[in-house]
Design a protein with these regions (language model features):
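Mid-domain alpha/beta scaffold segments of enzyme catalytic cores
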Residues: 1-207
Length: 207
């Protein structure tokens, strides 16, 4: 379906608010433009860790820039009243992404979120220990989307004031740990409706 038609139909379907996260400068600007076009859509602005990938991959863009400079270039976007969060940002050790650069970039986002008093949209793939350490250090509020950790860790994260997102990976046959975490969390501590619901569980659009 056409994205514009889908977004326009959301209020009638009972969806009150949507937050569209950016993953780089271009998509962050697009998210702000989309938020300005629909009263029930808001934007988040940030740089996804996969943007730092050094080699061509079929599912990610290749980053050849300076993330700190790009984050500074995004500064005017955070002044827009339609921008309600920082992100998507985080750590991803599944792809060949430089770890030092990822950590530095995530800390830059977390410091910015604290300065702006905005929540963050966090990405954590195969980087639980480092992510949890930064949560302890910066104490952000927001959501950790597409959660894949243990039930014990999920309870701790929720106790820090961070919502947990559970995406399409919950349907995987080997996702017992994730399903257990979901079952042991009180709602509305758990919620996720980002692109990963479709992206990581490819099927038909109607599904």
């Amino acid at each position: 379906a056409d994205r514009t038609e889908v977004l326009a139909a959301l209020p009638e379907a009972g969806v009150q608010l949507v937050v569209d996260p950016g993953c780089d400068v271009e998509s962050s600007r697009a998210a702000v433009a989309l938020a300005e076009a629909f009263p029930h859509v808001y934007a988040a602005v940030g740089i996804h860790p996969e943007s730092l990938i050094e080699e061509e991959e079929p599912t990610v863009a290749v980053y050849h820039g300076d993330w700190a400079a790009e984050l500074r270039d995004m500064a005017p976007l955070f002044g827009d009243e339609r921008v309600v969060a920082v992100g998507e940002c985080g750590l991803d050790h599944h792809w060949p992404v430089p770890r030092d650069a990822q950590l530095a970039m995530l800390e830059g986002h977390l410091r910015l979120a604290a300065e702006l008093d905005k929540p963050v949209i966090l990405h954590d793939r195969e980087a639980h220990a480092e992510m949890y350490e930064l949560i302890r250090k910066y104490k952000p509020k927001g959501v950790l989307h597409c959660y894949s950790g243990s039930a014990e860790d999920a309870k701790w994260i929720a106790a820090q004031g961070i919502y947990l997102g559970f995406g399409g990976t919950c349907t995987y046959k080997n996702a017992r740990k994730t399903v257990e975490a979901l079952q042991k969390l009180p709602l509305p501590t758990a919620a996720d409706a980002d692109l990963d619901n479709a992206f990581v569980c490819l099927g038909y659009a109607s599904e």
